Amino acid sequence: MLRFENEGTTISVKLPKTDYIVYMMANYSKETDTYHTKLYIVRKDVSDLVLIDDDYEMKSNFSSIRFDMGEYITEKYNKGFFDYYIDRFEYQQKCFDKGVEVVENAN
């Protein structure tokens, strides 16, 4: 059997008025008594998760970690945090589409 890593608790939140979903994963650290999180964004029609925040440390407990993660994502959304990543992703997709067009027309 291959060795696996427990990725802990994961939630997803659909961002209002967009085609994007944010995933947040949290792993509990016994050493610091905190959760270490990773934040990803994905457009619904593309299967690639894009890491946007790595190793945010969150003080919480097992019974409320999901709620606390949802609160964190909501706070970030209300401050416009995800706008940059959405704009960047849209730009990358346009560049990719243009590259495909160039390659297809070269043949």
Q: Language-model segments: which ranges?
A:
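Short beta-strand micro-motifs enriched in acidic
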Residues: 25-31
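Short, low-complexity interaction segments enriched in Ser/Thr/Pro/Gly
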Residues: 11-14, 41, 91, 95
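A short, compositionally biased
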Residues: 5-8, 31-36
